[in-house]
Amino acid sequence: MSLSAHEIRELFLSFFEKKGHTRVKSAPLVPENDPTLLFVNAGMVPFKNVFLGLEKRPYKRATSCQKCLRVSGKHNDLEQVGYTSRHHTFFEMLGNFSFGDYFKKEAIEYAWEFVTEVLKLPKEKLYVSVYKDDEEAYRIWNEHIGIPSERIWRLGEEDNFWQMGDVGPCGPSSEIYVDRGEEYEGDERYLEIWNLVFMQYNRDENGVLTPLPHPNIDTGMGLERIASVLQGKNSNFEIDIIFPLIQFGEEVSGKKYGEKFETDVALRVIADHLRAITFAISDGVIPSNEGRGYVIRRILRRAMRFGYKLGIENPFLYKGVDLVVDIMKEPYPELELSREFVKGIVKGEEKRFIKTLKAGMEYIQEVIQKALEEGRKTLSGKEVFTAYDTYGFPVDLIDEIAREKGLGIDLEGFQCELEEQRERARKHFKVEAKKVKPVYSHLKELGKTSAFVGYEHMEWESQVVGLVKGEGLVSELKEGEEGEVVLKETPFYPEGGGQIGDAGIIESDKALFKVEDTQKPTEGIIVHIGKVLKGTLKVGDTVHARVDKERRWDIMRNHTATHLLHAALRNVLGEHVRQAGSLVADKYLRFDFTHFSALTEEELKRVEELVNEKIRENLPVNVMEMAYDEALKTGAIAIFEEKYGERVRVISCGEFSKELCGGTHVSATGDIGYFKIISESSVGAGVRRIVAQTGRWSVETAFKEHQTLKKASSALGVGEEEVIQKIEELKEEIKDREREIQRLKQELLKLQIREVVKEENVGDFTLHYGVFEEVEPEELRNLADMLRQRTKKDVVFIASRKGDKINFVIGVSKEISDKVNAKEVIREVGKVLKGGGGGRADLAQGGGKAPDKFPEAVKLLKEILSG
């Protein structure tokens, strides 16, 4: 009986609904109120508190098809995914549950009825297992259902006894298997399709089992697995809801499924991981460097790495998101709602990692080669940390790559390196924290506070109420001394809300103090940080405080422009854009915002043009003070990270922009002059950054760029409008020449083969051997690959000498790899060359420190082949 996965899912849920079960919608992949789990990894997880007696539901019978993710902890299938036909990270679990209602007899009856009468599986092909001491379950299967004893297996605690933890609810289980025929072996012949858990005991701290007053039922049937049986497929990856993703991988890579094991592994990884990241991100898990986000980033980067192995060097996974959504949106309509968001996040992640993927792979291959040459069995903690920290490779991915070459990783050493980095960060944090000094609290206690008058004034007559030098209060600061000045009132704006502090001059009759920065270390205290240029400044002096007006005007232009930029981004990109951080300086502004992908040239152009349009309109910039709640009702945008009091300032630029803000601004947008975007980049998952300039600084940058264009035009000998075209032509010329160089290299190597490589018949094999001078390891592998395919009995042993180092490759025809194992042989010859190696049965590589020993290594190889 061939049924689609969607049909099987619906048949299951409908069947149990008819048996009095309430259909429960799948919970999100992120467990609710369960800090013990990163992800829902079994069908029973959403009902965990019901089983524990901590929660009551309005039903005693339930059925569900639960989204699951197994990537961490005890149930971690990540490293197996791709290498087997059954392991997945994401899968769906069909289940029926009883909370103190029916028990073994009904659970077994329902399961048997569903598999034999609804799914029409032949009874004679079905086997069951029971816990060795569960006589009740055995009798029900044997006497009530009628399964002969030879098709009932009694298994031990490891296979057929389930427990939630070391203590708590537990009980025996029973599994249903289908016999797929003699052409299959082991687990693939007798395939487990359904697990019935009879939760009838409570285990205490001493391991003592006590019967539960109301036993429960928890069953689980993997949808992908039962679909493979009903659709007659050899692998879960070939069923109707997954195989289109394999085909997607074929399409983007140009490789064919079923022709080569390594290709199949990569295509299965891509298919599985696409499902996992699509569902996880749709459920709100954004890739990051910690917790659930890090797990999803690991999955995504693992898929990218396998794509890279297939020759895919550009972002591609985001394109597959559409396919996952199209296949799965019928049972999970929420996928359609988040389609574009998921694609954007995935594409952004790919673009970030693709920049370091190639360099990271080269680095890892380099340290693997070094380890092999040195005869080490592991990559050092420092090497692993560099791959992790510099290139962004998850540790388990580094471990997987190393194991492919027969190496391990020094996990303990890696943890030490990681802890050292964290300690450096902690020390840095402690240094930063010292900025808040007890002296400021003392000033407040003395009533020596400051009032800010800088919204209306840039100059102000004031009085010195406090002087700080180092960690304490002083009565005076002399010429040449650095310190901090506290004024009764000040026009100097202290750093806050992303805006840098003002600079300027504080002058008395007898002293001149240069203000380099202004800070507000605690509420009510504004400190002017700088140096006495002339005379002596004393507490109680009357002073004239004068802000650097030109600098302040630059800052105000940038701050108002930041508001215009925020509004323009929301206008062009959508309402999802939110401020995620900002820096308003004098020479530039920096604005971080939420968005899932890099802005296109067209989007950047539209944003820049819209801001400049609003500048030309010379919109009035109005400031209003009002209650916080009232401000939000008017549509003013609040910044998530900021803390607001009951009264807030609302800055409006005409009808175009309205935000809560405590900074200083121009009085009309025309005062900004000109706005120019300098750069757009990523600062993290789902967060972009724009750096821009205004006023005189933007004009200066535009002038410099034009000067650069003029110089490029002159150097290339073309008009300014033809510079890009000329550069593209030159790039193509370089590519053509590089291709020609590669072609000539290959021709040269072929000529060298005739001169360098000798051929001898040894035993039943044809041996090709020789030493080249300074040939790259990759070219050496390619040569070995070519030579081992000449006949069906080729053994290749070629090497490349560079100084006192030697790299070498052993390759054998696939047809004889069961007789001559390259991976085993390379270890033996590697010893002679004072090194080692690893790889596959048909192709292995290594390195050593004794190039002069190559003839001896050849002699040993001949002895091995002669048998």
Curated annotation (Swiss-Prot):
Q: What does this protein do?
A: Catalyzes the attachment of alanine to tRNA(Ala) in a two-step reaction: alanine is first activated by ATP to form Ala-AMP and then transferred to the acceptor end of tRNA(Ala). Also edits incorrectly charged Ser-tRNA(Ala) and Gly-tRNA(Ala) via its editing domain.
Q: What is its EC number?
A: 6.1.1.7
GO terms under biological process: alanyl-tRNA aminoacylation
Q: What is the lineage of its organism?
A: Bacteria, Pseudomonadati, Aquificota, Aquificia, Aquificales
Where does this protein reside within or beyond the cell?
Cytoplasm
Q: Which SMART domains match?
A: tRNA_SAD
The answer to whether the entry has keyword Membrane is: no
Source organism, top-level taxon: Bacteria
Family assignment from sequence similarity = Belongs to the class-II aminoacyl-tRNA synthetase family.
Which InterPro entries does the UniProt entry name for this protein? aa-tRNA-synth_II/BPL/LPL, Ala-tRNA-lgiase_IIc, Ala-tRNA-ligase_IIc_anticod-bd, Ala-tRNA-synth_IIc_core, Ala-tRNA-synth_IIc_N, Ala-tRNA_ligase, Ala_tRNA_ligase_euk/bac, DHHA1_dom
Q: Name one GO molecular function term.
A: ATP binding
Q: What's the top EC group for this one? A: ligase
Q: Which reaction does it catalyse?
A: tRNA(Ala) + L-alanine + ATP = L-alanyl-tRNA(Ala) + AMP + diphosphate
Q: Which Pfam family would be a valid example here?
A: DHHA1
Principal location listed in the UniProt entry: cytoplasm
Binding locations of Zn(2+): 559, 563, 661, 665
Protein encoded by which gene: alaS
Supply the PANTHER family for this chain.
Answer: ALANINE--TRNA LIGASE, CYTOPLASMIC (PTHR11777:SF9), ALANYL-TRNA SYNTHETASE (PTHR11777)
Cofactor dependence is on: Zn(2+)
User: What is the designated name of this protein?
Assistant: Alanine--tRNA ligase
Q: What is known of its domains?
A: Consists of three domains; the N-terminal catalytic domain, the editing domain and the C-terminal C-Ala domain. The editing domain removes incorrectly charged amino acids, while the C-Ala domain, along with tRNA(Ala), serves as a bridge to cooperatively bring together the editing and aminoacylation centers thus stimulating deacylation of misacylated tRNAs. The Aquifex aeolicus domain can be used in vitro to replace the corresponding domain in E.coli.
Q: How is the cofactor bound?
A: Binds 1 zinc ion per subunit.
